Amino acid sequence: MIQALLVIICLAVFPHQGSSIILESGNVNDYEVVYPQKVPALLKGGVQNPQPETKYEDTMRYEFQVNGEPVVLHLERNKGLFSEDYTETHYAPDGREITTSPPVQDHCYYHGYIQNEADSSAVISACDGLKGHFEHQGETYFIEPLKISNSEAHAIYKDENVENEDETPEICGVTETTWESDESIEKTSQLTNTPEQDRYLQAKKYIEFYVVVDNIMYRHYKRDQPVIKRKVYEMINTMNMIYRRLNFHIALIGLEIWSNINEINVQSDVRATLNLFGEWREKKLLPRKRNDNAQLLTGIDFNGTPVGLAYIGSICNPKTSAAVVQDYSSRTRMVAITMAHEMGHNLGMNHDRGFCTCGFNKCVMSTRRTKPAYQFSSCSVREHQRYLLRDRPQCILNKPLSTDIVSPPICGNYFVEVGEECDCGSPADCQSACCNATTCKLQHEAQCDSEECCEKCKFKGARAECRAAKDDCDLPELCTGQSAECPTDVFQRNGLPCQNNQGYCYNGKCPIMTNQCIALRGPGVKVSRDSCFTLNQRTRGCGLCRMEYGRKIPCAAKDVKCGRLFCKRRNSMICNCSISPRDPNYGMVEPGTKCGDGMVCSNRQCVDVKTAY
């Protein structure tokens, strides 16, 4: 049985309470002092719970007072913080790459909530005392140990009581965006998703995250790798809490410290550094370590005010699923929020604007920030969903296999691992009538839990539809009657006419230019007249067919409708295009698009559909 602890934190009158004090977060001008005291919970009959085999408990509770009122903080260890194949890499003085697989599953990083507060959350490190933050009655409080020898004293304070290191707000370097207008976003938000789209959006998603610490940051922390690792772990724990609201789980799959020299030319030009890091990820990192997304943490001071930069709408892309972030603040949480902000760009989010709102003060995707922000705005959620439905990135749907999860298996982490029949979370969170949350075994006579071909704990009958056809180019999937799993998604053959002969099927979709224009520029947009596409025969402006080694290559006359896509609003005669300096494929006609009768785009050429597939 998992040990549960009740820790009573008694609020004490402290000589320095309310005065200024220097903490790890900086100079705090108002705080309260508390003394944590562990009191083990007792089983029925007064028997004390047995000590767990691990160093840190899976669940804990803390009771203390905030502003004179008692609160109970529930904590559960973030069991999925590290992937099963997590590695750490550093470099020897002679340049040799040294990679290890340290045991990190018995860690001290927790998520939690305040009892009886539905919207509360908490992120706590219990490695050496209690350090982190919790939300209580709409406000954010921080807790960290006081550096007093032989004392269990901790400080509790609000972020508003931390004196800023400087008055310059944190600014993201992203200036190019993918949105068109406020009206466009509002209209898009009013569109109704299909049931299949809703299922896709509601599906659990995973990001296998790789973090690189550059040599400048390494030297800033006096080459102390344990200190750097602890900071990074705290950052990922905070990011995980932020992204849980979007049904994303971020698993740290690797941490690399450039302990000898920088492996790229890290420079003050943030755009140049991002470009070089993206190339390094594609050419050097991915061949030796798989990951869905990577970020470079650097100690360099970027030119101007930006403290981070990322590609927009690029998750899963070998080069552009990347970001760079400056380690600009001693407050770890501020850097973590910047990391979450830049990852938000990778996931299709733009900067918030006037009508964008979230439950607490600042939102994660605000352009400027001097205070922490832990929630995404309504705009960010809509833009993120629109991006997911348009691009359907696949790497984030890869649910880890049971053999890839932490070994030995941990019951209660929502992953069905080796030896488990189901996993519906902790006993307090489990909503399943089919699964025993304590044992992670199916209830008596239950055949299944919550899979697509499971209904009331029994397999659905053979030929019951478990996944409807999404469109002309998809096929429905039917249950077998022998399994709870829905069969693998299959599609119509490539080249089959679709949408009343407007297009041809390609990998389960019907790519036509009209829909691509709407995805790029919003509702009410149409494809431009044919003469606009002749601009693709030239390399001036936005016309081109493809890029080769940074050089624009024009289209042949027969291929002009396989290059840049041109769209228009209403009866406009202007040839409009969409470009992104960081994504050469943005705004291009999609592969498989119809470019003439019996013709489709393949490798930027308009070819016969019969020979294309």
Swiss-Prot record:
Glycosylation-annotated residues: 436
Chain ranges of the Peptidase M12B domain: 205-400
User: Which residues does the record annotate as propeptide?
Assistant: 21-191
Tissue specificity note: Expressed by the venom gland.
Which cofactor does the UniProt annotation name? Zn(2+)
Q: Where does Ca(2+) 2 bind?
A: 410, 413, 415, 417, 420, 423
Ranges for region Hypervariable region that may play important roles toward cell migration: 560-574
GO BP terms: namely:
proteolysis
Q: Which residues bind Ca(2+) 1?
A: 208, 292, 395, 398
EC number of this enzyme = 3.4.24.-
User: D/ECD-tripeptide: where is this motif?
Assistant: 472-474
Coarse class of the primary localization is: secreted
Q: Which UniProt keywords apply?
A: Calcium, Disulfide bond, Glycoprotein, Hydrolase, Metal-binding, Metalloprotease, Protease, Secreted, Signal, Toxin, Zinc, Zymogen
Q: Which family does it belong to?
A: Belongs to the venom metalloproteinase (M12B) family. P-III subfamily. P-IIIa sub-subfamily.
User: What do we know about how this protein assembles, alone or with others?
Assistant: Monomer.
Q: What does this protein do?
A: Snake venom zinc metalloproteinase that seems to inhibit cell migration. This activity is dominated by the local structure of the hyper-variable region.
The protein's name: Zinc metalloproteinase-disintegrin-like atragin
Species in which this protein is naturally found: Naja atra (Chinese cobra)
